[in-house]
Amino acid sequence: MLLSYRVFAQAAETGLPDILQRIKPSVVAVGTYLPTRNPRAVFLGTGFAVNDGRHIVTNAHVVGKDLDSDHMERFAVFYRENDKEQMQMAELLTVDQQHDLALLRLAEAKLPALEIGDSTRVREGALYAFTGYPIGMVLGLYPVTHRSIIAAISPNAIPVVNSRQLNINMLKKLETPYNVFQLDATAYPGNSGSPLYDIETGKVIGIINKVFVQGSKENAISNPSGISYAIPAEHISRLLAGK
């Protein structure tokens, strides 16, 4: 039984290098651009192109900041094309706070779009991958890929030790629960908005949106828990249908 799983995993992973060639051109760094600021570009998270290639899906919390419109601050995406770093301005079209999703529209050129898969068919134990910018653009625009199994399909509200840790957002999640994918992979704050995809087909089955943090927020980088979460892609499909 163990041998058969290893053979299956190895067979699936042999196609990952080819799939990555299709995935990486669609993955962008999401941030803001302000001409009078130093630095002018500030990284917020990851996103990826969908539909016609001019629409970018990311997390609602990634684009949750208020823009300094008086000084012409705008959302922007950053990516590498033909080995050159590129930037495009983007407009925030819609936000789904309940499922932590947001949709941006590019101002100019379109990017290769990723296909949204059927997340209702995802099973625990299946192997997937996600690609994004875990520590931002510090090392340049080079998206990083991690593999992960679906460790569990569980409610979106993370358990708390005592009632003092409860907040309004957590209570809202308890009122309108839905399932998310729990992963056995280490994701970092910059991975928010990264596509979680099938390593055989490249179809997106989820979007990374949070990590389980032990202690303070700084521990997300210095002492990661190795537990991450992704929103199923069925909610992305609904967002796109209503755009």
Question: Can you name each region flagged by the protein language model?
Answer:
Residues 51-97:
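Catalytic-histidine neighborhood of serine endopeptidases
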Residues 50-51, 122, 199:
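Short, well-ordered loop/turn sites that connect or cap secondary structure elements
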Residues 23-40, 106-115, 144-242:
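Active-site region of chymotrypsin-like
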Residues 18-19, 66, 91-93, 107-142:
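Active-site substrate-binding loop(s) of clan PA
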Residues 52, 95-99, 153-159:
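Short, conserved beta-turn/loop elements at beta-strand boundaries and strand-helix junctions
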Residues 9-49, 56-59, 99-101, 238-243:
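N-terminal activation segment of mature serine protease catalytic domains
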Residues 73-76, 81-90, 124-129, 143-164:
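Beta-strand/loop subdomains of soluble extracytoplasmic proteins
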Residues 1-8:
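C-terminal segment of classical bacterial N-terminal signal peptides
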